[in-house]
Amino acid sequence: MHLRRPLRSRFFVGLAAASAVGALTLSSPATAVIGDGVTDDTYTFAAHLSIGEGDAKRACTGSLVDAQWILTASSCFAAAGQPAYPIPAGAPALKTTATIGRTHLTGTGGQVVEVTELVPRSDRDLVMAKLARPVTDIAPVLLADSAPVDGESLRALGYGRTATAWVPDRLHAGAFAVTATGATTVAVTRDGGTICKGDAGGPALREQDGKVLLAAVHSASWQAGCFGSDATRGDAVETRTDDVIEWVTQVRGLPQGSQAASGDFNGDGREDIAAFYDNGTSTTGKNRVSLFAFYGTASGFGEPEKVWSTPGGFTWSKSQLTSGDYTGDGKDDIAVLYDTGSSETGNITSLYTFASTGAGFRAPQKTWTTTGGFTWSKSKVTSGDYNGDGKDDVAVLYNTGTSDTGNVSSLYTFTSNGTTFDNPRKTWTTTGGFTWSKSKVTSGDYNGDGKDDVAVLYNTGTSDTGNVSSLYTFTSNGTTFDNPRKTWTTTGGFTWSKSKVTSGDYNGDGKDDVAVLYNRGTSETGVRQAALFTFTSNGTDFAAPKEVWTSTGSFTWEASQPVSGDFDKDGKDDIGVLYRAGTTPDGRRIDTVFTFSSTGTGVKAPVKHWMGPII
């Protein structure tokens, strides 16, 4: 892949390798092996990037600069025949996998994570690549805050070719001397090393006073001494990173993941939508989150308001969002089930409540915690007024393990006393045969008795006619839950993994129903499709699902988070969707809110009420 610079020589090229490659060529051409193999468990922030598949496969190197971000060269992702920069923001055009913290690629250490999003610079060969999930057990590298100077020695890392290997399997390192520093680039010459194909995006490190700092990333090289190259010049060009710290910090702090909930947060009788965003990490490495409210109006939803944020210390990936009127004051609040870590007595989980003030939310209050023995990762949370006292409670479907008769699940209820939550009570359990990982949980008053119940959309397996899903209802008796009843099932053709579930009274008869936003896949023309099904309650069971809407244009199920509420204040609940609509060139996520207004027997076509970047 050629770097888009004025032509200097046919050897001066970009460094993304056109095949899976591994090591950096860093030594004299006279030696048998160019470059030093890196000792295991050092430079664990280094990442090997595998981009594309088959004949289009290429490889690059990068650096973990945040638990969920890799800094590398944008030329790695540029399409054939296109400039190295700028490249389009958003999802990579080719499937990209990052291997972080694995010195030997044939080993098993480190983490292997898919890259899901690119945030490029427009002025240089540089891009931030977002990982599908945070890598929390590997320390990111810090960025140098001053430019490399003439004569300075930098240590370069990479997984690219060596003098003798086209496809090495380990990280290599070697020295380079700085010869000049420009506005966005650094010129270097070999001082015991050579940069080869597959090293693009790899780090050039400043090592001094016991610190390792990222000073630049590899962009282009003459490739002297590299396998398959007859070049003799040892020059290379690096992309500066010392002057983009503010940009890297901004990207790290951009809203990433989101969780949605609905409720009447300002008490005006019209339900609203809340979005809980992952704001990455601060410059000091602290995790940040924010809470936005989309308040409903007579004409729809306006621009979201940031109603709470933290400069650090609250981790989105350890949070499960739910909502309800926990104080009984007529305004819905937000609750977060939080992974607090572990103690000598086991895993610790806590409940935080963001109490509504009507105009916003108070700072979160820890309204319940355990000293150990309650595992967040085994919990699925929902809310409802299960005892009918006018205050919503929290329920957790819990993975209790296994028994001789199969997988064991339990329901725990955290009853609100208006200020905090009582310790959880096990209000239902099974001796075996109910699998937590096959369950999606929701709440509603399905029999109309004034007490909310719990429903589970369950993956029942397969039949000759396709995938089988079922609905189970756990009816509240005010104190505990009755054993679950199968209130609907299909003989095949309804896929659990393609379903997102929510509850509401869509026909206004006083009994809550269930809705499923369903993934219809991709059409023959490449258009993403979705559908909406409603399961109407008759007070005892649910009617067979009715397909009340199917997308006619592009509607991406993976980008959708459905919630329910009476958004138009007509006495019938509607469906709302918080939808990720794209990414701005500077990496900010673009969200929109859709509502599917209930007609009593179906829903109207979705209406887009607001769309814009989340800051």
Placement of each model-derived feature along the sequence:
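C-terminal subregion of chymotrypsin/trypsin-like serine protease catalytic domains
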Residues: 2, 64-78, 90, 203-256
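Chymotrypsin/trypsin-fold serine protease catalytic domain
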Residues: 104-118, 122-194, 208, 223, ...
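Catalytic histidine site
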Residues: 43-90
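Secretory targeting and sorting signals
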Residues: 1-32
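Conserved catalytic-core segment of clan PA serine endopeptidases
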Residues: 33-42, 53-54, 85-136
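Conserved hydrophobic/aromatic beta-strand scaffold that supports enzyme active sites
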Residues: 46, 69-71, 126-130, 173-175, ...
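Active-site-proximal beta-strand/loop segments in catalytic clefts of secreted hydrolases
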Residues: 49-52, 65-67, 73-76, 100-103, ...
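Trp/Gly-enriched beta-strand/coil motifs that build multi-repeat beta-propeller-like domains
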Residues: 256-615
